[in-house]
Curated annotation (Swiss-Prot):
Pfam families the record matches: CheB_methylest, Response_reg
Protein name, per record: Protein-glutamate methylesterase/protein-glutamine glutaminase 1
Protein purpose: Involved in chemotaxis. Part of a chemotaxis signal transduction system that modulates chemotaxis in response to various stimuli. Catalyzes the demethylation of specific methylglutamate residues introduced into the chemoreceptors (methyl-accepting chemotaxis proteins or MCP) by CheR. Also mediates the irreversible deamidation of specific glutamine residues to glutamic acid.
Reactions performed catalytically: [protein]-L-glutamate 5-O-methyl ester + H2O = L-glutamyl-[protein] + methanol + H(+); L-glutaminyl-[protein] + H2O = L-glutamyl-[protein] + NH4(+)
Gene that specifies this protein: cheB1
Domain topic, free-text comment: Contains a C-terminal catalytic domain, and an N-terminal region which modulates catalytic activity.
List of residues that carry 4-aspartylphosphate: 53
InterPro entries in the cross-refs: CheB-like, CheB_C, CheY-like_superfamily, Sig_transdc_resp-reg_Me-estase, Sig_transdc_resp-reg_receiver
PTM remark: Phosphorylated by CheA. Phosphorylation of the N-terminal regulatory domain activates the methylesterase activity.
Length: 336
């Protein structure tokens, strides 16, 4: 994989070079010391992946991510020495299309290969995404269920560009929205709690991490909060599970959407937002096959038109809408 490094700290650049050296297939094609230089170099020689720092002179990593995704799009992973201190910048960069975030590998002390493992694992997953691997087979649709209980659920999946898209969508809903909401965003569990707090502050809604064994409830927005998959069980409660182990991203949107299609006893809407790859497309199609309304974000409003495009390609979405039109549509479907 052709990889670029954007970082103004020589020690951090060296740490990344050493980590990448453990995988001979990775090649560092260029290094930039600030965001402006990265924008220029990316236009001249677009890599497969950029390892982007956040705090740099001239232009920071957030603005560089925005510019690159608009002008010379490619996969971007935020690499920082202090994720917790930079949590809001991380979400902003992810809103512009960054795929993931990881700590800068340490130099000195301990096992260097072990220190490099988290970064190399994320790069491996992204390699699968940008390689557009064939979609995995899915279980056959379950038999239609009675919806006499009339419980209401909105199942939302998002990835690159998701934090900003979720902020817009949730701001368009009232605090006492009549449907339960469950969010599956591709984000490391280290950041899940911070993301829930950020979305709650931005939207004014009750956004929190989903807890094992609790049912989705109207008025609550539950965010998948671990690196395991979240799924709906037959009894209507939520559970975290390591299976299936072959899913590239954890938590998987497909896994959750499929569980909703199979086990939700009520009315539901599936919403697939911006993101790279195709996670969520097959699950959304299964929801549609079960008679649920399904919505995909349109290309123009998507930071990364990957997952919604995959859904549109297999006719998984009943409706394709601009981001700003999705919340009003949900209010039409589930009025007070």
């Amino acid at each position: 994989m052709k990889i670029a490094i954007v970082n103004d700290m020589p020690l951090a650049v060296e740490a990344l070079r050493r980590a990448l050296a453990f995988e001979p297939a990775h090649q560092v094609v260029w290094v930039a010391s600030n965001g402006a230089e990265a924008v220029r170099l990316c236009a001249e020689n677009t890599p497969d992946l950029i390892l982007m720092d956040l705090i740099m002179p001239v232009m920071d990593g957030v603005e560089a991510t925005r510019r690159i995704m608009a002008e010379s799009p490619c996969a971007i992973v935020i690499v920082t020495v202090d994720r917790q201190q930079n949590v809001h910048r991380v979400f902003e960069a992810m809103g512009h299309g960054a795929l993931d975030v990881v700590d800068t590998p340490a130099i000195g002390g301990g096992n260097p290969q072990e220190a490099a493992a988290p970064l190399l694992r994320k790069i491996l997953n992204i390699g699968w995404l940008i390689g557009e691997k064939t979609a995995r087979s899915r279980p056959a649709p379950a038999a239609p269920r009675s919806t006499a209980s009339r419980q209401r659920l909105v199942a939302i999946g998002s990835s690159a560009g998701g934090p900003a898209a979720l902020e817009v969508l949730l701001k368009g809903l009232p605090r006492h929205f009549s449907a339960a909401i469950v969010l599956v965003q591709h984000v490391d569990q280290v950041f899940a709690a911070g993301m829930a707090e950020w979305l709650a502050s931005a939207s004014g809604l009750d956004v929190r991490l989903a807890r094992e064994g609790e049912p989705p409830q109207a008025g609550a927005v539950l965010l998948a909060g671990t690196n395991h998959h979240i799924r709906l069980l037959k009894n209507g409660t939520l559970a975290y599970t390591a299976e299936p182990v072959n899913e590239i991203y954890r938590p998987s949107i497909d896994v959750f959407f499929e569980s909703v299609a199979n086990y939700w006893n009520g009315d539901a809407v599936g919403v697939l937002l911006t993101g790279m790859g195709r996670d969520g497309a097959q699950g959304l199609k299964l929801m549609r096959q079960q008679g649920y309304l399904t919505i995909a974000q349109d290309q123009q409003s998507s930071a990364v038109y990957g997952m919604p495009k995959a859904a549109a390609a297999i006719d998984a979405a009943v409706e394709i809408r601009p981001l700003e039109k999705i919340a009003p549509r949900l209010l039409e479907i589930f009025p007070k």
